[in-house]
Curated annotation (Swiss-Prot):
UniProt xrefs under PANTHER family: DEOXYRIBOSE-PHOSPHATE ALDOLASE
GO process terms (BP): 2-deoxyribose 1-phosphate catabolic process; carbohydrate catabolic process; deoxyribonucleotide catabolic process
Official protein name in the record: Deoxyribose-phosphate aldolase 1
Gene, per the UniProt record: deoC1
Originating species: Mesoplasma florum (strain ATCC 33453 / NBRC 100688 / NCTC 11704 / L1)
Function: Catalyzes a reversible aldol reaction between acetaldehyde and D-glyceraldehyde 3-phosphate to generate 2-deoxy-D-ribose 5-phosphate.
Cellular component annotations (GO), alphabetically ordered: cytoplasm
Gene3D superfamilies: Aldolase class I
Amino acid sequence: MKLNKYIDHTLLKQDATKAEIKQLCDEAIEFDFATVCVNSYWTSYCKELLKGTNVGITNVVGFPLGACTTATKAFEVSEAIKDGATEIDMVLNIGALKDKNYELVLEDMKAVKKAAGSHVVKCIMENCLLTKEEIMKACEIAVEAGLEFVKTSTGFSKSGATFEDVKLMKSVVKDNALVKAAGGVRTFEDAQKMIEAGADRLGTSGGVAIIKGEENNASY
């Protein structure tokens, strides 16, 4: 199985340095990963480093809590795309979902998608904080909002992707959206199992180790 184009090569830790971001991009070019996934401060630098390659740039929005206003998320998206982002990973308004304020959750996603235009938008759901029913509802709303992906986790909460959650998400979105598994994908075997469960993309800081058949224990 050729995994490279499944991988969003990720570096989101708050103490990431310019040298580490350069290494991330160099590795993404070498292994021809789908995208690098970074915070917005680094987007324009990644654009410069990745110019002329097939590697995209995923920018996180409302990260990692998802609890900022809709207007803030939309502004973040506009700035990210202006700086060179090709894909957006937005964090769901988790509190609003738990309060069953589904209208706000939907409008939040729609506003991000509107700001993103033709760019791919993934909704990060933070499944470890959600019930099975909440995961299913969030997937349904993401499809209604026209988002291209649903995503399991930020990698910054209690736990990351599970095979069971990926299967559940895929069963809800079917062919209407894709699924991204993130957090805890550390080995080639993990990656294979996630893909078999229904994942179309993998968010991991260990893309190089995974491709080489090693285990990654680096922070996200």
